[in-house]
């Protein structure tokens, strides 16, 4: 720790009324920062007012800075009073006074411009941010056939604007703070004031304020610092890149955490069923959506249990199979030198390797690697009598079922649970299969997220089952979805009024 910084990495000292002291301090603190731009000049009729301007090259809008700040100050008719800066600059720039060097340097490193005046024990902060960023693009990770196509970017302000564009309500609040003692990353909590539960909001704010770490660079990191129960493989927060999903979640009383430099937004609290919901579920008719959701729940059971079920049947209980199926199983396994458990684990781990390789390879090559690699490896393993054709089918169906679930974080938990069930079934057969599923369900029922049961609406404490299940496995018609979820503020759960024609 140097003599400029505190133990929490904040800068010491206040702004000096002597401009040379401020120049010396800034030059020392920002030593070897070649992207720092420093300009010293004098203004006024007789050039009697000394100014010192500081900003970071590449982080500011230099054209705006020149037109709105520097050019008005350099006018020959500029009066002698320092307070005249207000009249010349305030009208054309967003600004405020700051008193400490910590505020000044943080502002500069955040893309703002700081102006020091000789004789003033404070400085002027001008908002001049212009970060290099990509534009709004299609949501490539959460593809929807119908509905909006835009997605979040790495810009905090652009992301909040995408949400604000969809909710034009004065009660939509944006609380902006910083996190990370060194990175000082901006983040914003967004919620609707009359829908959010205040105790949940306060808990989240307290947790965010308690985080003391060098830097937070993505919401995936922030999620791990916020979670209270790190012993569960199931995600306790939802990440999304779709503004429409965030907007609809906020209008259900949930809270969005928008982090600068992250193209994903964090939503909380969450329940088990939200991970089975896709954005276009609400843009299609309820019959289609209900059918697809039932398929997703079936796919979840298949992705967790099918390999383990095969191990249990083939290794312990072949007698439960009808004779034609049993003969087919014996014929398929003829010549395979490995026991069933080794056979299944070999193919499952091979598929996981192919999946990881496909993710890491660039562009279209990754998808090609997954398809072609799977075909080649599977066929070669069957031809070499290392695995049976039935195992290849089981692994392929499991993979397809996993990809049918619309949330990547959630499917990662299912992939781990799959191996958990395979091991149990290898030791205890069908008893291990049912015991494993029972353990998973008990675990889900005991989880909670900021006081909200994770298994909601299957765990319903207040007896409102008719309203709790309106957006579960069966998605009601939009006209009948009259109530918001249980984690909405008490007294604000009516989403739409009764239709007089329906009475």
Residue ranges and their predicted role:
Residues 1-305, 323, 444-503:
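Membrane-embedded alpha-helical signal segments
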Residues 300-320:
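Hydrophobic alpha-helical segments embedded in or immediately adjacent to the lipid bilayer
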């Amino acid at each position: 720790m140097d003599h400029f910084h505190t133990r929490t990495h904040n800068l010491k000292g206040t702004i000096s009324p002597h401009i040379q002291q401020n120049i010396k301090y800034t030059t020392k603190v920002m030593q070897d920062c070649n992207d720092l731009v420093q300009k010293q000049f004098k203004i006024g009729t007789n050039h009697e007012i000394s100014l010192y301007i500081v900003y970071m090259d590449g982080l500011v809008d230099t054209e705006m800075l020149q037109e709105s700040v520097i050019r008005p100050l350099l006018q020959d008719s500029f009066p002698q009073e320092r307070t005249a800066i207000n009249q010349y600059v305030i009208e054309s720039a967003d600004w405020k006074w700051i008193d400490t060097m910590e505020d000044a340097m943080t502002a500069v490193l955040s893309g703002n411009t700081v102006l020091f005046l000789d004789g003033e024990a404070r400085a002027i902060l001008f908002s001049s941010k212009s970060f290099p960023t990509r534009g709004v693009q299609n949501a490539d990770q959460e593809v929807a056939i119908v509905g909006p196509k835009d997605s979040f970017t790495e810009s905090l302000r652009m992301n909040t604007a995408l949400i604000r564009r969809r909710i034009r309500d004065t009660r939509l609040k944006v609380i902006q703070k910083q996190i990370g003692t060194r990175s000082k990353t901006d983040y914003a909590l967004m919620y609707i004031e009359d829908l959010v539960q205040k105790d949940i909001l306060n808990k989240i704010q307290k947790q965010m304020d308690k985080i003391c770490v060098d830097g937070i660079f993505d919401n995936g990191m922030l999620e791990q610092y916020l979670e209270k129960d790190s012993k569960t493989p199931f995600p306790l927060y939802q990440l999304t890149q779709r503004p429409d999903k965030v907007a609809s979640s906020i209008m259900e009383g949930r809270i969005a955490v928008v982090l600068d430099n992250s193209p994903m937004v964090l939503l909380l609290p969450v329940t088990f069923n939200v991970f089975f919901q896709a954005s276009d579920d609400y843009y299609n008719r309820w019959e289609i959506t209900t059918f697809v959701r039932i398929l997703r729940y079936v796919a979840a059971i298949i992705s967790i249990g099918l390999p383990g079920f095969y191990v249990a049947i083939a290794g312990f209980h072949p007698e439960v199979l009808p004779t034609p199926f049993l003969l087919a199983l014996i014929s398929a396994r003829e010549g395979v030198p490995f026991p069933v458990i080794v056979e299944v684990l070999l193919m499952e781990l091979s598929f996981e390797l192919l999946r990881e390789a496909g993710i890491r390879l660039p562009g279209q090559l990754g998808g090609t690697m997954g398809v072609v690699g799977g075909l080649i490896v599977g066929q070669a393993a069957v031809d070499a009598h290392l695995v049976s054709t039935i195992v290849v089918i089981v692994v392929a169906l499991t993979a397809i079922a996993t990809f049918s679930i619309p949330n990547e974080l959630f499917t990662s938990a299912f992939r781990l649970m799959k191996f958990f069930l395979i091991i149990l079934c290898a030791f205890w057969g069908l008893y291990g299969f049912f015991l494993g599923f029972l353990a998973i369900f008990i675990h889900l029922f005991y989880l909670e997220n900021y006081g909200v049961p994770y298994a909601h609406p299957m765990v319903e404490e207040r007896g409102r089952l008719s309203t709790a299940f309106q957006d579960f496995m069966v998605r009601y018609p939009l006209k009948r979805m009259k109530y918001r979820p249980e984690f909405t503020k008490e007294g604000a759960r009516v989403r739409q009024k009764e239709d007089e024609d329906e009475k």
